[in-house]
């Protein structure tokens, strides 16, 4: 990732707004993680190959999937893309627009934290499924119903152990239920 002015502005705003919430930056990327035990809330300030600037993507990454990469498994709405592209024109303009994206990301992080409670997660998943019928993410949501099954817990613990071994993820929280 180029360390250009747009990236520096994003990082500073995230440092001011997201990091105090306990969200951490994955390495030096534009990816920010909120560790919620069985899932990460993933906030991405996605660059474009065509112009300096950013999109905002936010979604959950479920740890029972045992992936060795961060994926966007479950969005707040129908898509992971929360906000369209802001093109960098100058520092003042970009900071003024990006702060709204960082504030939106912080609101979604706080919302998703409510899903740490399994009853809340199940209720939300049911409402989400009714709203977005025939969505391919139905299997992800059905797994919430089996969150305390031994096999699901084993997968979560194994995946958390994998991510904890990565230097870029050393700020993960500890959870008695989900850590080895």
Please name every model-derived segment:
Residues 1-6, 32-180:
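Intrinsically disordered, low-complexity regulatory regions enriched in serine/threonine/proline
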């Amino acid at each position: 990732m180029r360390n250009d002015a747009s990236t520096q502005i994003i990082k500073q705003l995230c440092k001011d707004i997201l990091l105090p919430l306990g969200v951490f930056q994955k390495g030096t990327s534009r990816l920010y993680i909120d560790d919620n035990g069985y899932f990460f809330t993933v906030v991405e300030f996605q660059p474009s190959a065509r112009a300096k600037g950013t999109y905002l993507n936010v979604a959950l990454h479920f740890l029972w999937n045992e992936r060795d990469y961060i994926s966007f498994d479950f969005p707040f709405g129908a898509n992971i893309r929360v906000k369209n592209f802001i093109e960098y024109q100058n520092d003042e303009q970009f900071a003024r627009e990006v702060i709204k994206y960082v504030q939106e990301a912080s609101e979604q992080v706080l919302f998703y934290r409510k899903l740490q409670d399994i009853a809340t997660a199940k209720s939300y998943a049911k409402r989400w499924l009714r709203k977005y019928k025939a969505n391919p993410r139905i299997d992800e949501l059905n797994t919430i119903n089996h969150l305390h099954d031994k096999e699901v817990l084993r997968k979560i613990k194994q995946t958390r152990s994998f991510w904890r071994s990565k230097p870029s993820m050393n700020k993960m929280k500890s959870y008695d239920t989900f850590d080895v």
